[in-house]
Amino acid sequence: MRSSSPSQPPSIKKAHRQAKRRAIRRRRIDLQCGCSIYFHIDCTGHGFTHRGIHHCTSGGEWRVYLGDSKSPVFQDIQSRGPAIHQNEDIPCTNTVQPQPEESVASPQSLPELPSLDDFDDSFWVNLFK
């Protein structure tokens, strides 16, 4: 009885050529700041941070880029600045975090160590005997 499978396996080169011609499947994300970002379809479930705001692929901001006249291009966005403080009830504080001043004293975790000049000469003589 004849085998149903061919004696030679099909060439992978044909599949590679077709894959190169195929368009890259990606989604377009239109953010509130006016920026548009594209990400690969297989990258769902991953988040990213843009201008200090974290975005997740499960949110409602994701839209499929369809192209031509159906493209979700939003031209009504006036501001391209980051919208970090949207609630006016919350005062906008200084974004620079103050750093503690440096001091010449020992850190709290280390006890005060004596100066090497305070040791007697006999200490050094006995140390190096």
UniProtKB/Swiss-Prot annotation:
Keywords: Activator, DNA-binding, Host cytoplasm, Host nucleus, Host-virus interaction, Inhibition of host innate immune response by virus, Metal-binding, Phosphoprotein, Suppressor of RNA silencing, Viral immunoevasion, Zinc, Zinc-finger. One of its GO terms (biological process) is symbiont-mediated suppression of host innate immune response. Signal peptide: none annotated. Phosphorylated. One of its GO terms (cellular component) is host cell cytoplasm. Monomer. Homodimer. Homooligomer. Self-interaction correlates with nuclear localization and efficient activation of transcription. Monomers suppress local silencing by interacting with and inactivating host adenosine kinase 2 (ADK2) in the cytoplasm. Interacts with and inhibits host SNF1 kinase. Binds to ssDNA. Strong activator of the late viral genes promoters. Enhances the expression of the capsid protein and nuclear shuttle protein. Acts as a suppressor of RNA-mediated gene silencing, also known as post-transcriptional gene silencing (PTGS), a mechanism of plant viral defense that limits the accumulation of viral RNAs. Suppresses the host RNA silencing by inhibiting adenosine kinase 2 (ADK2), a kinase involved in a general methylation pathway. This is Transcriptional activator protein.
